Amino acid sequence: MSSKIRIGIAGYGNIGRGVELAIKQNPDTELVAVLTRRNPETVKTLTEGVKVVHVDDAASMKDDIDVMILCGGSATDLPVMGPQFAEMFNTIDSFDTHAKIPEYFDAVDAAAKKGNNVSIISVGWDPGMFSINRLYSEAILPEGSHYTFWGKGISQGHSDAIRRVEGVQDGKQYTIPSEEAMAAAKSGSEPTLTTREKHTRECFVVAKEGADKAAIEKTIKEMPNYFSDYDTTVNFISQEELNEKHSKMPHGGFVIRSGKTGNGENHHVIEYSLKLDSNPEFTSSVLVAYARAAYRLAKNGECGAKSVFDIAPALLSPKTAEELRKELL
């Protein structure tokens, strides 16, 4: 019997394929199944011997999978998949609609408790790694301000939201941080910066033939939780140009905390940054690390939804507590 953590992937897009690659770098994990809405016979995985199962048959895999990593989009997939799968499996997901995290957590929590499973939600880099750094820096510098900047890079969640607009064939969205706002945040002066002042959003959209471009642009710019709070530019281009100039998926960003200690005379700036060649592959690597934590928590008898705030760092590592103290402390 295998002692490896048996992982399933639900959704075989950019994140799903990234998870498959990340599993290859984690010897204590193995991929046993990919779940898809497509005809399973048309899906070719990178790993030999992996079952491809239609998502409607997920329940048949309950005894074969330790942790299911949900790789759907946050706009419409995960609000349904999250609770549905949490009742059947221990799950990890990258739900990233910040404004809706509390209600999503509650829905997944109820389902996970019903199924006696562990579900860690909103895992990735933001929410995820950036969230943890916001918490650490705020706890250390309680008198201060924090600032989060994303980009320049392609946002998967916002690109997914664009592609779901009626009349859109394909699209990518770049998040662009303001250099002036970043410099002000790093200065230690604790400026007040609005959402609109910190970033702009630029969309490259391929419209379907005959689609109403004005309606598409209006829908995108007015989309709540995604574009309505930002200065957004919508560029209509051909599929060929999108494929040629916008096929890579770089991203990154900064979490900055500026605060004071003593009697306010000493200023401090904490900064955490990421520069990513592949947003989906990095996100997937975080998901796999948290799958290890979910597996361990479930083995210890825990259940319900968790966020990255609830997970002790040592649970993410394949190393023993002794190894961690010796090598990293």
Specify the residue positions occupied by each region the protein language model found.
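Hydrophobic/small residue at the entry helix of a nucleotide-binding pocket
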Residues: 15
